Amino acid sequence: MRILVLHGPNLNLLGSREPGLYGRDTLSEIDAELQQQAERLGAELVCFQSNHEGALVDQIQQAASEMDGILINAGAFTHTSVAIRDALLAVKLPFVELHLSNVHAREEFRHSSYLADKAVGVICGFGPISYYLALEGMVAHLRSSQL
C-alpha cells in the first residue's frame, strides 16, 4: 500500500518555528520516523512539502494513479484552500487531515477546516505523534476497506 504524506506551508521550519507550539523535531526527523513506522506496517510512503498551494494540488492529482491514500497537514491552507479540497475530492482517495497543534485551542480562524468534513479522520494536538497516529489510522482504514 502506498501513502502520500503532504506537508503544507511553513512546515519546513519545524524545529525552529515556535518550538513551544510545534515541538523541536525537524520535518526531516518526522519523515524519517514516519518512514520507519510505515515499513513496520507494510506501507510505502512518499513525503512532500511545499509552501505553494499549486504544488500541493499537483501532488494530490498525481497521487490518483499512484497512491492508495493521503495524509495531509495542509497548515494554513486547511482554513483557506478550496483548491486543495477540490483536488482531494477529485482524486477520490481516502485522506486523513492532521495538525501538530490543537487547532481548536488556538485562534478562532483556525477552528474551520475546508478538509475535515471529507476526511476519513482528523488528528490534531499531539505534536509529531499526530503524524504517527494518522499513519496508523490510514493503514487500518485501507486494510479494512480491502476486506
Curated annotation (Swiss-Prot):
Pfam family, one: DHquinase_II
Residues the UniProt record annotates as site (Transition state stabilizer): 17
Gene3D superfamilies tied to this protein: Dehydroquinase, class II (3.40.50.9100)
Protein EC: 4.2.1.10
UniProt binding sites for substrate: 73, 79, 86, 100-101, 110
Catalyzed reactions per annotation: 3-dehydroquinate = 3-dehydroshikimate + H2O
PANTHER family found in the cross-reference section: CATABOLIC 3-DEHYDROQUINASE
Family of the protein in this entry: Belongs to the type-II 3-dehydroquinase family.
Name the record gives this protein: 3-dehydroquinate dehydratase
Organism encoding this protein: Synechococcus sp. (strain RCC307)
Gene: aroQ
